[in-house]
A protein has these predicted regions:
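Glycine-rich beta-alpha loop elements in corrinoid/cobalamin-binding modules
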Residues: 36, 40-167
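N-terminal [4Fe-4S]-dependent radical SAM core
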Residues: 142-145, 151-198
């Protein structure tokens, strides 16, 4: 299926969406990469990632793209959920055959409430959605895909949760999706050099911090690692393919959780 992965347009002053672990309003402009959308996008050949806020794509411009795709995957956040629902409805009005999936923290915590918010949402995927979205785009029925919640016979069907992804090396490099679909010069964070690239070297965090979004709503508490070789190779590729790049940032929940692994990677 032709698939659009969307970090939707947001209201002015909102620093959130597909890449932010702390969705909030802000006083200065900053943008994180939509990294969670880019992993499954790398698994689907006929896909595109649209990160609307940093690329200054309006709601109307976004909605107009609906006719070009068969599947919309929208990463939503709690502050932006109501606006995201309206955007999905606009796109469904333009292309009634468009299948719409919502992913992100709100749908993990309250999947039924999310589906009740709009009939434009066909299904939601809880927590890690990389392979669930790939499988649907490749033709699997919703009833066969773990972690999916959808409407069926006037009720909601909750499929069993998928196990966490253990083999992180099997996932695509998000840097290649950045190169394909995003302008890396548009991303900035005040405490990082500009321009920068960020990606993950691990998923999950054993800590129980209440202020951090991802372990509770997306990646879980089991700490899983990419191999050092895979990380180093992606770093090399990134440096070769993004002229002028000044920093690579590892946005892990707990990068230095294991001392020996940190030393191995840094050496």
């Amino acid at each position: 299926m032709r698939t659009l992965f969307l970090n939707p347009p947001s209201f002015e002053g909102f620093d959130g969406g597909a890449g932010s672990r702390w969705p909030a309003s802000r006083e200065i402009e900053s943008y994180w990469y939509p990294v969670w959308l880019c992993y499954p996008a790398g698994l689907i050949p006929d896909s595109k990632v649209l990160d609307a806020p940093p690329h200054k794509v309006s709601i109307d411009q976004t909605a107009a793209m609906a006719s070009d795709y068969e599947l919309l995957v929208l990463f939503t956040s709690t502050p932006g959920f109501n606006v995201d629902v309206k955007i999905a409805g606009m796109m469904k009005d333009i292309n009634p055959k468009l299948k719409v999936a919502f992913v992100g923290p709100p749908v993990t915590i309250e999947p039924e409430k999310s589906l009740r918010a709009s009939t434009a949402i066909d299904f939601v995927v809880k927590k890690e959605f990389d392979y669930a979205i790939r499988d649907f785009a490749m033709g699997k029925s919703l009833s066969e895909i773990p972690s999916v919640v959808f409407r069926k016979n006037g009720d909601f069907q909750h499929n069993p949760d998928a196990p966490v992804i253990e083999d992180l090396d099997a996932l695509p490099w998000v840097s290649k999706v950045y190169k394909r679909d995003l302008d890396f010069r548009r991303y900035n964070v005040p405490f990082l050099l500009h321009p920068y690239i960020s990606f993950y070297t691990s998923r999950g965090c054993p800590a129980q911090c209440t202020f951090c979004l991802w372990p509770q709503t997306h990646s879980g508490h089991r700490w899983r690692l990419r191999s050092s070789d895979d990380i180093v190779n992606e770093c090399r590729w990134t440096l070769e393919n993004f002229p002028g790049l000044k920093e690579i940032f590892f946005d892990d929940d707990t990068f230095n959780y294991q001392k020996a692994r940190t030393i191995e990677l840094c050496s």
